[in-house]
A protein has these predicted regions:
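Cytoplasmic helix-loop-helix junction between adjacent transmembrane helices
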Residues: 1-19
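Intracellular juxtamembrane helix-capping segments at the cytosolic ends
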Residues: 1-5, 203-216
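Helix-loop-helix hairpin linking two adjacent transmembrane segments in secondary transporters
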Residues: 16-63
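Flexible cytoplasmic inter-helical loops of multi-pass small-molecule transporters
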Residues: 59-83, 279
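Extracytoplasmic gate region of multi-pass secondary transporters
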Residues: 92-135
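Helix-to-loop junctions at the C-terminal end of transmembrane segments
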Residues: 145-156, 246-247
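C-terminal transmembrane helical hairpin of 12-TM major facilitator-type secondary transporters
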Residues: 157-208
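A late C-terminal transmembrane helix in Major Facilitator Superfamily
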Residues: 218-248
Length: 279
């Protein structure tokens, strides 16, 4: 995607991420429907779909590689001086970016795990409403990942990452306080804050990946492994700790421990530097 994006890497990554966001939002609905109507063995249908998509990608991959080379040549002709510069890795700033990735991953994975429980246990809703809240949380990401990519191309990825954290931090703090609100406004505010958190996470998805690949221009594969792979899993390590805190104290109190991670992430974003100024 880095090569296919040409000069619009954020837009390309945002388009690519729509597929993943759609899968997170729609997948559980399909899986639940199949499991309830056909039975657990019906989930084998996902294996068939995976095989079909893998076959299509295998057939089309030579065309994709050819297209990437064509785009590389076009970029080289338009920016001969840029291409002539040797590629460099800026590990210091990638390390700072990793702090942001960690703070976002911890919050996203824990929220993902505890939204249904928070809705049912703390807000007094039905399990169905808890699942619906989770679907809303993922659905907003389908649109905001693409918008985040466009904004990253226009204003630069660092500004969008900062904007994302500026939205996410207060929304996360207020969400933990929602159970103390009046019942009349409790649910509307809860859904509004949930949308803000989902939008904030998705908004910075493409800019984080693009910025990571730019900081490690000589090691794009490694950068992709961190920004695309580790970012999706490392937060899950903290989830059991938060769950234990929820059992010991309360779920809102446990979720409040996520706020300092966002504070650190926001602070780290303020010392990031534009890769263009480092060259």
């Amino acid at each position: 995607m880095n090569r296919l994006g040409g000069g619009k890497k954020g837009k390309a990554m945002g388009t690519f991420a729509i597929g993943g966001s759609s899968g997170f939002a729609i997948g559980p609905l399909f899986a639940g429907s199949i499991a309830y109507t056909v039975g657990p063995h019906g989930l084998a249908a996902f294996t068939i779909v995976g095989l079909i998509i893998s076959t299509v990608l295998f057939v089309l991959m030579p065309c994709i590689v050819t297209q990437a080379r064509t785009i590389d040549q076009a970029v080289a002709m338009e920016n001969p001086t840029l291409v002539a510069k040797p590629l460099k890795n800026y590990w210091k700033y990638f390390g700072i970016l990793f702090i942001i990735i960690l703070s976002q991953s911890v919050n996203f994975r824990v929220i993902n795990a505890f939204i249904p429980i928070f809705w049912t246990r703390e807000l007094g809703t039905s399990p169905e409403q808890g699942s619906f809240a989770l679907t809303i949380f993922f659905s907003i990401g389908i649109f905001m990942t693409y918008i985040g990519g466009l904004l990253g191309d226009k204003y630069g990825p660092i500004k969008i990452i900062r904007l994302s954290l500026l939205i996410w931090l207060p929304a996360m703090f207020l969400l933990t306080e929602v159970p103390t609100f009046s019942p009349v406004i409790m649910m509307p505010i809860a859904y509004m804050l949930l949308l803000m958190i989902g939008a904030a996470k998705a908004l910075s998805y493409s800019p984080v990946i693009v910025l990571g690949q730019t900081y490690l221009a000589k090691s794009i594969g490694f950068a992709s492994g961190i920004t695309l792979g580790v970012s999706q899993t490392i937060g899950g390590i903290i989830a059991p700790v938060v769950g234990n805190l929820a059992d010991t104290y309360s779920l809102p109190a446990a979720m409040m421990t996520l706020v300092p991670f966002l504070v650190v992430g926001l602070g780290a974003s303020l010392i990031l530097k534009d890769p263009k100024k480092l060259q």
